[in-house]
Amino acid sequence: MLQTEMKVIQQTEIADKVYELILTGECVAGMSPGQFLMLKPSRSDLLMRRPISICSYDKTAKTCILLYRVEGDGTRDFSKLSEGDTIDVLGPLGKGFDIDTTPAPKTALLIGGGIGVPPMYQLGKELAEKGVQVMFVNGFQSAKDSFYAQEMAEYGTVHIATVDGSLGTQGFVTDITKNFPEEPDVIYSCGPKAMLQAVKASFPETKTYLSLEERMACGIGACYACVCPKADDTNKQFKVCEDGPVFRADEVKL
């Protein structure tokens, strides 16, 4: 983990209020799929850092891509960044996805919902490079919210569900996965809690890893703002930022 400044290479709005931010910096060397960065807004009245998941990285070029949706003052501040600007970053943080499971999977199902889609990209890329057959299932509210289908298609098959039916299957990600003829060897998922609950319930016998989305204040486990109950003892809790954000589905109570 480093507290450092990263330089903006490029920023583009790629969907409705969703931005692709390309950064460069030394901290890229320590990144792994499923981790996140804590970004500090430039405005002096915005004291808290914002957690942004890592979409992809290139360790040789020392660049990474973050995808985020503008939802408040902090992310609105980030959306004003342009080429050559710098941003104060803490990271990479958290425990990411386990891609070295034993036995090695032949098939992997990657399920993302909304702004939970970005971490699926680098994960799918690295799994595909290991020879795993990758299936992406992405869920969005509408076609205008959809992104990265073309990029993901380089590493696996892509299925899209939209609530309003404007793109792909009308409904939710589970309306797609319930029609798959065979269960995958492993499932990785990131998105809203309701979606993760549905994924967990749909595949009770499949090895499943869930990346939890929680509001975070410190990002390093000091403030207990992002706790999640343990499945085996509801009196004990995980700190999502430090113990996760990725957990086995059987570890957590959603």
Curated annotation (Swiss-Prot):
Binding positions for FAD per the UniProt entry: R50, P51, I52, S53, L67, Y68, R69, G74, T75
Cofactor note: Binds 1 [2Fe-2S] cluster per subunit. Binds 1 FAD per subunit.
Metabolic or biological pathway: Pyrimidine metabolism; UMP biosynthesis via de novo pathway; orotate from (S)-dihydroorotate (NAD(+) route): step 1/1
Signal sequence bounds: none
Domain FAD-binding FR-type: from-to ranges: 1-99
Cofactor(s) needed by this chain: [2Fe-2S] cluster; FAD
This protein's UniProt keywords: 2Fe-2S, Electron transport, FAD, Flavoprotein, Iron, Iron-sulfur, Metal-binding, Pyrimidine biosynthesis, Transport
SUPFAM superfamilies linked: Ferredoxin reductase-like, C-terminal NADP-linked domain, Riboflavin synthase domain-like
Record-linked PROSITE patterns: FAD_FR
Record keyword Nucleotidyltransferase present: no
Residues binding [2Fe-2S] cluster, per UniProt: C218, C223, C226, C241
GO molecular function: 2 iron, 2 sulfur cluster binding; electron transfer activity; flavin adenine dinucleotide binding; metal ion binding; oxidoreductase activity
One record GO biological process: 'de novo' UMP biosynthetic process
Pfam family of the protein (one): NAD_binding_1
InterPro entries named in the record: Cyt_c3_hydrogenase_gsu, Dihydroorotate_DH_ele_sf, Dihydroorotate_DH_Fe-S-bd, Dihydroorotate_DHASE_ETsu, FAD-bd_FR_type, FNR_nucleotide-bd, OxRdtase_FAD/NAD-bd, PyrK_electron_transfer
UniProt keyword annotation of tRNA processing present: no
UniProt record similarity statement: Belongs to the PyrK family.
Job of this protein: Responsible for channeling the electrons from the oxidation of dihydroorotate from the FMN redox center in the PyrD type B subunit to the ultimate electron acceptor NAD(+).
Complex formation: Heterotetramer of 2 PyrK and 2 PyrD type B subunits.
Protein name per the record: Dihydroorotate dehydrogenase B (NAD(+)), electron transfer subunit
Source organism: Listeria monocytogenes serovar 1/2a (strain ATCC BAA-679 / EGD-e)
